[in-house]
Regions:
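PRPP-associated nucleotide enzymes
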Residues: 1-199
Length: 199
């Protein structure tokens, strides 16, 4: 784990509000997707919400593996599940939670275009300033490590897996609470994970 990782932890309601704002931007742009493509795992929640808000019932998935830990990635993203629907001749909106390096988003966009989509646009909730790709629609830019509400336990587990030192674990999980994750939830997950773990 990188030293001095700082976190941003939006709540469910904050993410939903950002997606409401994003819906308006998409509508105002005149883009009307035929299919929404959620990048699993991180983009699934946002894709499902945008499917509802934009009233686009056609929802597909694609899976990319890139992250191996908190603030840690593989050298390159790997497409592990091809798109789950036919997109040939359709307008596709690719949705992910964050454009960090931009490599995953580029990989998926290239894949969807290769599958014959006639137009592809991208949407993320967050974007990092160093991302190689600027999504067509993005709600917020940050340089912090984002912990979404749908990955709280996963994040706590990755912190524990990096440390056998209880003090280091407590310091890192305290930063999660400071960023806005509910303390009782972090403590619950920490207790569950530590009970399974033998350092």
């Amino acid at each position: 784990m990188k030293i001095n990782v700082e976190f941003e932890a939006p709540t469910w309601n904050q993410v939903y509000d950002m997606l409401l704002g994003q819906t308006e931007k998409i509508r105002q742009s005149g883009f009307k997707p035929d299919v929404i493509v959620g990048v699993l795992k991180g983009g699934w929640f946002s894709a499902r919400v945008l499917s509802d808000l934009l009233e686009v019932p056609s929802l597909a998935t694609v899976t990319v593996e890139f992250y191996v830990g908190v603030a840690e990635t593989k050298n390159e993203p790997v497409l592990t599940q091809r798109i789950s629907a036919v997109v040939a001749g359709k307008k596709a909106l690719i949705v992910d939670d964050v454009a960090d390096t931009g490599k995953s988003l580029k990989l998926v966009k290239d894949h969807v275009l290769q599958e014959g989509a006639k137009e592809v646009r991208t949407a993320t909730v967050y974007r990092k300033p160093w991302s190689a790709i600027k999504p067509d629609y993005c709600e917020k830019e940050t340089s912090l490590w984002i912990v979404f509400p749908w990955e709280t336990k996963e994040t706590v587990r990755k912190i524990v897996e990096k440390h056998c030192d209880k003090r280091a674990i407590n310091m890192e999980t305290a930063k999660l609470v400071k960023a806005g994750l509910p303390q009782p939830l972090v403590e619950r997950f920490l207790k569950e994970i530590l009970e399974e773990r033998d350092c």
